[in-house]
């Protein structure tokens, strides 16, 4: 069992990274803080992902569908499905991304 503080996790790019492999669990989580206009390129993961929007507004593309997602929105991304998000609001975007894998694996498209 571990008790951690968010600030103890490494901050890489735009997120604090909870890497399951380092914590002895089979999933990973990323606490994202994205500035307006910021987001990753279109990409895939070999596992499923669930994104919980906590604050702000994101434009999220999953496969061929693009939607605006606001605080409280949840997006499920199947494994190997192209997806991306961008902070489309005027304030910071905060979201928690849960990856169904013990380490981060991403293929940019």
What function would you assign to each model-found segment?
Residues 6-42, 98:
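A short glycine-rich, His/Asp/Glu-containing loop-to-beta-strand
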Residues 19-21, 39-45, 86-88, 107-108:
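Short histidine-centered beta-strand/loop micro-motifs
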Residues 33-35, 45-60:
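Short, conserved beta-strand element in jelly-roll/cupin
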Residues 39-40, 59, 75, 79-84:
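Histidine-centered metal-chelating micro-motifs
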Residues 57-59, 66, 82, 92:
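Structural motif
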Residues 65-79:
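Short acidic-glycine-tyrosine-enriched beta hairpin
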Residues 79-104:
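Ligand-binding loop in jelly-roll beta-barrel domains
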């Amino acid at each position: 069992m571990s008790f951690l503080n968010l600030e103890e996790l490494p901050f890489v790019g735009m997120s604090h990274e909870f890497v399951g492999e380092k914590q002895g669990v089979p999933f990973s989580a990323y606490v994202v803080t994205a500035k307006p206009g910021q987001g990753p390129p279109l990409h895939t993961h070999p596992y499923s992902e669930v994104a919980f929007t906590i604050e702000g507004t994101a434009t999220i593309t999953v496969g061929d569908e693009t939607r605006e997602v606001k605080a409280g929105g949840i997006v499920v991304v199947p494994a190997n499905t192209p997806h991306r998000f961008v902070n489309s609001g005027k304030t910071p975007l905060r979201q928690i991304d849960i990856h169904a894998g013990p380490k981060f694996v991403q293929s940019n498209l």
